[in-house]
Structure formats: C-alpha cells, structure tokens
Regions:
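Conserved acetyl-CoA-binding loop-helix of GNAT-fold acetyltransferases
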Residues: 78-81, 86-101, 233-245
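A conserved beta-turn-beta hairpin within the catalytic core of GNAT-like acetyltransferases
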Residues: 64-76, 86, 214-224
Length: 310
C-alpha cells in the first residue's frame, strides 16, 4: 500500500471490514476517490485517540440528467465503522457533516445501493427513500451474437479514436425521470477501475459492457454491467445478442444482469435473493425537495456500472 496516499488509512479500514482484495493495495481508492473527472470524493473520517481510523463515509460526485437538463449529483459509496466503535453514532456524525458538503456542489440529492440491513436503518432513521431491490436475472445465450464485436478494454483502447467515437453520444436516449449522465471522459474513467477487467460488445444498436465473475454454485458467468443504446437504435433494444457476446468473450456458459434499463430488455430467470450473496437495495436521499422531491423521485436506468459493485 502507498502510505503517502491521502486514502491509505481509509483503504486499510475498508480492506479489514469490507473487501480485502479490492482495498488492500490502495489503488482502488486512489482511482475511485482521487481520479474521478467529475470531482474528488467527498469524505468524512473519524480517528480514535491513537490516530487509528475507526469511521469512514465517502460519496462521489457525478451528474444526472432529467427532461430539463443535467445537474450535479452524488453517488453514495463506502461506509464503514470499526466493530469496537459501533452504536456510538459515528455514521450519524459523519452523515450530518457530509450532507451539506455534498449539497454544496449543487447536487439536489444522492443515490446508491445498500444491503437490506443497512437500507432499513438509513430509510427509517435518516429519511432516505427505498427505490426498490436491484433485480438480477440469470440468462443463457439463445441467439447468435450477430454483428457484435468484442473489444478488451485497456489503456491503449481508451486513448483511441475508436473509443472516443463509440462514446461520443452515450446520452442519446430520452429520459423520463432521473438517470446518470454519461460521456466519453466519465466512461473512460469508470473503465479504468483497477479492480475489474472489462470487455465492450459493440453492435449495430448498442454498446454493452461485461466482466467475468461466478454465478450460482460457482459457475463461471459473464456479468453484463451496462447497455448503452446507440443513436438511431429501435427502442427498446433487445439484449439477446449482447448476452451471447458477453458469454463468448468471458468464456462463460451463463450470464447475469443486474438492475433495470428503461430502453433495454434483458430476458432471463429472476435470481432468488437466497442465491445472491448480498441483495442490493437502490436508495435515494434528497437535499432539495423543490428540485428533487422525494415522493416523485424515480431512476429510469440503474445497472451495475452505475454503482461500484463491478
């Protein structure tokens, strides 16, 4: 771990409590918190008297769009408190400091995912809204991936004219309520995640993003993390050819898709929550009820790449 990183102590805490593989080296937070083109992470930390980090809450600036245009927004990310310091109100202390700082960038609210236990706490005690469980479907290739090219993502590809062209109009589809806004710079940053290796699947009506993981019973699985309809596509895009391409590229017999997309249809069998290691709930908190009223807030599209699972 790079001890000179401003996130070194936080990486150590998150490695101990959340995910050792992802956080231990420190590279993930240097990227996720420090290299975001939409702004560095807004963080609140609590250390004990000996200087050990015992509490952390981090949120990440992004942009959302509505029919009226785009606005700064916030993705709520990592929360951790040392087991020895729990039930001391550390999350409340950090949240009360971070909310006004997040609102200060012009964001009317924040959204993210939480497990069922944590979501119950923030909904009941902190005024967040439950936007629904993030569904997951299990599917297999049933059509040939006709017309779809697979591109392994690396630094050279992300710096290429081809990537710039593919990512030139990611927000081409209409929006009804709220949705994360994407452009080439933001997608390029997102695909530089040091914890994942992505493949793009470029077809006539969409660009999909996949990674390799394991599904139920440890079966190798392609995970479709995002589907971007291309300009001129007939909506909704039927994702069968992209599922097949993802399985081909990831050398997996099955595919998992999580979330929902207002302009894409992914057919499959819903994965029961008992087979999911950590079922996720999509949650929202408003900072400005005039701009983002809680009762009416909806997200058109939420997929794995809109969060930080992959």
């Amino acid at each position: 771990m790079n001890r000179d990183s401003p996130y070194a102590a936080t990486s150590e805490l998150l490695a101990d409590l959340l995910n050792d593989r992802r956080f231990r080296s420190g590279e993930f937070l240097d990227w996720f918190y420090g290299a975001n083109p939409r702004g560095k992470a807004i963080v609140e930390d609590i250390d004990d008297d000996a200087g050990k980090r015992i509490g952390h809450y981090g949120v990440v600036p992004t942009r959302y769009r509505t029919p009226a245009g785009t606005t700064p927004f916030i993705f709520t990310s990592n929360v951790a408190t040392d087991p020895g310091a729990r039930r001391k109100g550390l999350f409340r202390e950090m949240a009360e400091r971070i909310y006004p700082r997040a609102a200060g960038i012009g964001a009317p609210g924040l959204a993210g995912t939480s497990n069922a236990q944590s979501s119950a706490v923030i909904i009941n005690r902190f005024g967040w809204k439950d936007l629904g469980s993030m569904p997951a479907v299990f599917t297999v290739p049933v059509v040939w991936p006709r017309g779809v090219r697979d591109i392994r993502v690396d630094d050279a590809f992300l710096a290429s004219d081809e990537f710039a062209a593919l990512a030139s109009d990611l927000d081409c589809v209409p929006v009804r309520d709220w949705v994360q806004s994407w452009d080439a710079e933001f997608l390029g940053w997102r695909l530089r995640n040091p914890d994942s290796t992505y493949t793009l699947h470029v077809g006539p009506d969409a660009v999909a993003v996949s990674v390799r993981d394991h599904g139920p019973l440890g079966i190798p699985a392609a995970v479709v993390c995002k589907v971007f309809p291309r300009p001129g596509a007939k909506l909704p895009v039927v994702a069968g050819r992209y599922v097949a391409a993802a399985c081909r590229a990831q050398r997996a017999p099955v595919c998992v898709y999580g979330g929902w997309n207002a302009h894409v249809r992914v057919r499959g069998v819903k994965v029961p929550e008992r087979f999911r290691p950590s079922p996720l709930v999509v949650v929202f908190k408003s900072f400005d009820e005039d701009r983002a009223p809680t009762p009416a807030f909806r997200i058109d599209t939420w997929e794995f790449l809109d969060g930080d699972v992959y």
